[in-house]
Amino acid sequence: MKPIFRRVAVIGKYPGPGAVSASDSARQIIESIAQFVTQQDCELTLEAETAAHTGLTQYHTLDVEGIGRQCDLCLVVGGDGTMLGVGRRLAGYGTPLVGINQGRLGFITDIPLEGYQDALTPILHGDYEEDVRPLMQACVMRSGECVFEALALNDVVVNRGSTSGMVELRVEVDGVFVSNQRADGLIVASPTGSTAYALSAGGPMLHPSIPGWVLVPIAPHTLSNRPIVLSDATEVAIEVAGGRDISANFDMQSLASLQHGDRILVRRSAHRVCFLHPRGWSYFATLRKKLGWYEGGS
């Protein structure tokens, strides 16, 4: 039986310079997956930096954007952070992603590295669960001009520096004033990001099918300042009204330094990310496994 995905790319997490043993391990993992994919009668492409850092230069290579233009499927080897970065860069191309977990928790990179072949074979032949996640589009407005913009799959976070005091943030939703918040910061999280930083700050978990966001204050000065669930059709504006050493980050990977009066606008992006999971995948099973929920009977 021929695979339905003919051109398959692999993007891997690789260690920094000097980590020899980790580099050898990364090479072995990527090479094993590459060989497996070619054995499935697929045309393999390695992401260029992955190939360079692992020394696997015998394979066809493309940069991430080239993968988006030319490949039918992308296998991401690493943790959720790796998947977030790849997902944002490929969102505009509609390339489906499969995560092979080489990290720790693995909410969206859900296929274990050990035994990945058993999970991956049916997916390559068209037997999978599709899971589409929305992205957020954010920009930093300064004196009426956008000075920084980024996509986020998990969250947009405005917070204070490590040695500064609380920040004061004016929050509006669709142009309607909500509150002035004094806190360590504020999180705007998607359903995907609701199990990340927002959860540790006391926010609720949103099912991926819910078209919403959650607005979560970080250590607020007023204890009645609680998380709010919003429609993702709204535009959230966060204005820096007070404080110093303030920044905005997007999926904890892109960072913008903020000034007094800056406004961060967050709206739903036109782009989405499509994850493919093994048949039988369940969001609730993922929560039980990753969060250690009790599974016993009465």
UniProtKB/Swiss-Prot annotation:
Report the active site residues.
Answer: D80 (proton acceptor)
Keyword Ribosomal protein (UniProt): no
Gene Ontology MF terms in the entry: ATP binding; metal ion binding; NAD binding; NAD+ kinase activity
Instruction: State any GO CC term.
Output: cytoplasm
Which GO biological process annotations does it have? NAD metabolic process; NADP biosynthetic process
What catalytic activity does the UniProt entry give for this protein? NAD(+) + ATP = ADP + NADP(+) + H(+)
InterPro entries named among the record's database cross-references: ATP-NAD_kinase_N, ATP-NAD_kinase_PpnK-typ_C, NAD/diacylglycerol_kinase_sf, NADK
User: Which UniProt keywords are given for this protein, alphabetically ordered?
Assistant: ATP-binding, Cytoplasm, Kinase, NAD, NADP, Nucleotide-binding, Transferase
Is Glycosyltransferase one of the keywords UniProt gives this record? Answer: no
Give the binding site residues for NAD(+). D80, G81, N154, D155, R182, D184, T195, A196, Y197, A198, L199, S200, A219, Q253
Q: What is its EC number?
A: 2.7.1.23
Q: Which family does it belong to?
A: Belongs to the NAD kinase family.
The record ties this protein, via HAMAP family, to: NAD_kinase
The name this protein carries in UniProt is NAD kinase
What are the top taxonomic ranks of the organism?
Bacteria, Pseudomonadati, Pseudomonadota, Betaproteobacteria, Burkholderiales
Q: Which gene encodes it?
A: nadK
